[in-house]
Amino acid sequence: MTTILKHLPVGQRIGIAFSGGLDTSAALLWMRQKGAVPYAYTANLGQPDEDDYDAIPRRAMEYGAENARLIDCRKQLVAEGIAAIQCGAFHNTTGGLTYFNTTPLGRAVTGTMLVAAMKEDGVNIWGDGSTYKGNDIERFYRYGLLTNAELQIYKPWLDTDFIDELGGRHEMSEFMIACGFDYKMSVEKAYSTDSNMLGATHEAKDLEFLNSSVKIVNPIMGVKFWDENVKIPAEEVTVRFEQGHPVALNGKTFSDDVELMLEANRIGGRHGLGMSDQIENRIIEAKSRGIYEAPGMALLHIAYERLLTGIHNEDTIEQYHAHGRQLGRLLYQGRWFDSQALMLRDGLQRWVASQITGEVTLELRRGNDYSILNTVSDNLTYKPERLTMEKGDSVFSPDDRIGQLTMRNLDITDTREKLFGYAQSGLLSASSATGLPQVENLENKGK
């Protein structure tokens, strides 16, 4: 069976991931006119730039959908977001600022839940708006086929007939108007935005040029913290975790995790927390650039890692970071539910997150400027009395440290011998200044 269909399957049911925007509206109407039977599926991901979710399925029916459904994905999305925080599943960082993989998390949820809904309706052909140059076409492909082994893929944007007729936004707008729908193109922004409850992605157009900075972006989850005219008073916030799960903000508990994430977004968003500018490697290895918002994810991540460093030992923390980066890359590639990802997630959640219980108090200022004011946990292995510089009882004595240092003589002697061995083989050069062999000055190489 052909998995990817290059041309419209006339007379067959096609499920389309319907956003209500110009692209998917024109595609749905065009498919109906050409003889297909479109079914529209809209994911409610708590997008901060969407005002009326219920209106989207109604518009789909007006444009010719055989049926239109709104699928509430918010609970599952937040669950996956918290799992990513517990595992540190983030691999793109620049100068200490993190991209929280909010789009990959959204695709994992959308790609499975929408296809599951289609399967319930007997719809086994799926189309969406992802382009052939991006990451989403592969993410949706993987998640769709994982959910429904009989799934076939039809994308209007890969169909030459559709492209020839409606290849651009102007043509799509004219097509909608000609069909009796007063669909005017929205005002073109200098960049494209995609969002869900966990975060927003701004990319493309002017942002493809590296001399266009974050300053051209209008945040949809935060504030322009770089604008000195925007007043942002400092604010204290306390985050509480129990066994790796965020349970309270400023002492307030919530009826569900969706409400907690919304409040975390509001708190972090007031300061522009969690915005970052990243150059990243797409799945196809080409580099792209994005500016990201994730105020709630950032707030929870900061508090979680503060507790992590106070509770776990150095080797565990090292494995958390190494495995988290590996897991973050798998998530980015659309492999969040693959066996290698599940293996990493299980270990990180079982042995790391389960011990993260306590409270962290932060002072948030502008952007990613914050201070940690207090850290409280019954599980802390940080115990200041062990290393206090004040006179008093200690868990070890000066004689104990002398013995420990004496044992170091073994590897110090071995290292010294290796250094002189490297010098004899020409890998290092002698140094009169230190008495130890040195790496040769690069300026002198080749002279």
UniProtKB/Swiss-Prot annotation:
Record-linked SUPFAM superfamilies: Adenine nucleotide alpha hydrolases-like (SSF52402), Argininosuccinate synthetase, C-terminal domain (SSF69864)
| Single GO cellular component term | cytoplasm
User: Kind of enzyme, top EC level?
Assistant: ligase
- GO BP term, pick one: argininosuccinate metabolic process
Q: Which residues bind L-aspartate?
A: T131, N135, D136
Q: Which InterPro entries match?
A: Arg_succ_synth_type2_subfam, Arginosuc_syn_C, Arginosuc_syn_N, Arginosuc_synth, Arginosuc_synth_CS, Arginosuc_synth_type_1_subfam, AS_cat/multimer_dom_body, AS_multimer_C_tail
What Pfam families does the record point to?
Answer: Arginosuc_syn_C, Arginosuc_synth
Catalyzed reactions per annotation: L-citrulline + L-aspartate + ATP = 2-(N(omega)-L-arginino)succinate + AMP + diphosphate + H(+)
State whether keyword Amino-acid biosynthesis applies: yes
Q: Does the keyword Cytoplasm apply?
A: yes
Instruction: Tell me a Gene Ontology molecular-function term this record carries.
Output: protein homodimerization activity
Q: What are its E.C. numbers?
A: 6.3.4.5
Q: Which residues bind L-citrulline?
A: Y99, N135, R139, S192, T201, E203, E280
Pathway of action: Amino-acid biosynthesis; L-arginine biosynthesis; L-arginine from L-ornithine and carbamoyl phosphate: step 2/3
Q: Where in the cell is it found?
A: Cytoplasm
Where along this sequence does the record place binding of ATP? A17, F18, S19, G20, G21, L22, D23, T24, S25, A43, G129, T131, D136, D194
Q: Which family does it belong to?
A: Belongs to the argininosuccinate synthase family. Type 2 subfamily.
Q: How does it assemble?
A: Homotetramer.
Q: Which NCBIfam families match?
A: argG (TIGR00032), PRK05370.1 (NF003779)
Protein name stated in the entry: Argininosuccinate synthase
Name of encoding gene: argG
